[in-house]
């Protein structure tokens, strides 16, 4: 295996929010896969036909775009997506089959919340998992593509929608906070939940405000989850164009990217692989001012403060290097998954 390629790690140690992993991070995963898939003409032709000429880079952001179409508690949008009519119609049918107000909701398909405390693997417990989380939905899409699951399924996932979802979910499952979550007891202390005592979840970091160290001082970096979705990508790749990054990443084989077994087993392998990273993403932080509300299953707010380490790597630098590696693997794995599923 070759080592990660020499794209400069451009880390700016400042606070701030950026675009979500969707627009740039997801696009990068798709763009790398586009380059890789181009080397397999039959698979590339099949994907092109299903997507009516759209690239994986483009469609990788669509699942987040339709999340915004029916944001919970708001009136669903009827505005068509900027995609071919058939693709739009199939995505809208998928949306209707899995509405925000229903169960399952397509919002649930993007993540799983395995507790980071305790060393569990995905199959080692039940807290934070569901039959409709990302570890279940990736193989569902694989089965649609290989014909094991009919396109007339209850989830409204056609082969076209399956490709679109996989282009996105392969990015999500390589983002550590889409797989691992912190849980707290009634006193606001991290703890290992059980089915009898599930505690209070942090929604994959969505309820925690991150404070990183900048020149020795704490500065707010926004919500912990959003930081990993967006700022880490900007820190990792700076102002380099997507085409430049994708070209370099697609030509250099990432370390330890290949997975064993059938494609419908890969999601659980990827989840188990990213869980130690999710644990470190939390272990590097101290949690303070954790607040809860009676009757709620999640915390309402809290602080996640970077720990001061003598001679250690800053959180921002470590996170950016991690995201660069995960996007690299995600792109190669997306191409391999589509090739294997469309044989």
Tell where the protein language model's regions lie, with residue ranges.
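N-terminal, motif-rich segments that launch catalysis or mediate targeting to/interaction with membranes
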Residues: 19-167, 176-343
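Sec-dependent signal peptide recognition
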Residues: 1-8
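Hydrophobic core
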Residues: 9-13
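N-terminal signal peptide c-region/cleavage motif recognized by signal peptidases
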Residues: 15-17
